[in-house]
């Protein structure tokens, strides 16, 4: 598997693919996991900005959706609606979603009492110990009188699910989720979280905070559970596992270069830390990442520009 260290070192081939109809607005801000992608559309081209990259693509004929291409940069962007898929140098990035829209499919959950709502393309289902219920058609609307992105999912007349784009921490496992949820049902309100935790960390390069090395150690998570990065001396790759209980890494493979003593020491610290990781937290509006062992912080990282 080809290793990629950071967006600034990415190769020349960037492919974006997607699903749904062309965005209605001229400017669209996508969240591709933790990677922010800004798209500016016109009738003949689209300009994409992500990390420190800014690329202009020309419109091309397409049987479905909207296709844009920059052949010199070997870059394509095909989108339909609020969702898109980004691929860079053969590496598939997390699904890109317009930040003003909810994912077409997502789950919300809470504890004490347990509840779980699955929303899937306009329908929903509720799972509770007291019984299950299906909703063949639900209405999703944006709530306009809030400071952040908030949506109301109307399950039925007296049952609603509220989703807000603020990071939520599971009350039992401590797992972070990208959305905060509230289920209103039978004159009661149940709190919880929604979305997929991997979207908080995947798609960007995270650099070790306050490193004294010229090239700081870094790590990048992808939505297919692959992980790769730079230890301070060698490049590494492998897999991570994200469950409802926490985060862990499978054994990592690394190159075998010898480096200066301070680089070798940084590498040893990083590999030992990754071997002990059980949880993660994010902060500073998603720009910082802490890899933890229970309550102890092992690595502090910042989102690379």
Where are these regions (language model features)?
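An ectodomain-focused feature that recognizes extracytoplasmic/extracellular
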Residues: 100-124
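Post-signal peptide N-terminal segment of mature Sec-exported envelope proteins
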Residues: 26-51
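Short acidic-hydrophobic surface loop/beta-edge motif
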Residues: 28-31, 68-69, 106-110, 151-156
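Bacterial N-terminal signal peptides that target proteins for export
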Residues: 1-8
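Lipid interaction determinants
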Residues: 22-27, 66, 80-108, 136-140, ...
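C-terminal motif of bacterial Sec signal peptides marking the signal peptidase cleavage site
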Residues: 15-18
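Periplasmic N-terminal soluble interaction domains immediately after the signal peptide in Gram-negative
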Residues: 73-74
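Central antiparallel beta-sheet cores of small beta-barrel/beta-sandwich binding domains
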Residues: 51-69, 117-160, 237-238
């Amino acid at each position: 598997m080809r290793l990629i260290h950071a967006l600034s070192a990415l190769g020349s081939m960037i492919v974006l693919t997607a699903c749904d109809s062309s965005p209605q607005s001229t400017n669209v801000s996508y969240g591709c996991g933790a990677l922010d992608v800004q798209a500016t559309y016109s009738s003949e081209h689209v300009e994409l900005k992500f990390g420190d990259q800014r690329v202009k693509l020309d419109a091309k004929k397409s049987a479905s959706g909207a296709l844009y291409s920059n052949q010199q940069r070997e870059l394509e962007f095909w989108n339909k609606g609020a969702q898109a898929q980004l691929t860079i140098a053969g590496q598939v990035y997390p699904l890109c979603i317009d930040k003003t829209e909810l994912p077409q499919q997502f789950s919300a959950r809470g504890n004490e009492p347990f509840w779980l709502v699955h929303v899937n393309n306009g329908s929903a289902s509720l799972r509770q110990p007291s019984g299950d219920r299906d909703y063949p058609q639900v209405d999703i609307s944006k709530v306009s009188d809030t400071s952040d992105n908030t949506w109301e999912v109307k399950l039925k007349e007296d049952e609603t699910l509220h989703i807000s784009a603020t990071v939520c921490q599971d009350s039992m496992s401590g797992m972070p989720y990208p959305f905060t949820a509230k289920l209103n049902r039978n004159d009661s309100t149940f709190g919880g979280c929604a979305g997929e935790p991997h979207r908080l960390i995947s798609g960007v390069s995270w650099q070790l905070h306050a490193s004294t090395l010229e090239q700081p150690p870094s790590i990048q998570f992808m939505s297919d559970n692959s992980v790769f990065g730079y230890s301070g001396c060698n490049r590494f790759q492998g897999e991570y596992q994200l469950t409802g209980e926490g985060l862990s890494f499978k054994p990592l493979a690394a190159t075998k270069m010898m480096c200066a003593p301070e680089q070798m020491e940084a590498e040893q610290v990083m590999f030992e830390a990754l071997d002990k990781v059980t949880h993660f937290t994010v902060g500073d509006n998603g720009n910082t990442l802490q890899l933890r062992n229970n309550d102890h912080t092992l690595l502090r990282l910042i989102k690379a520009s």
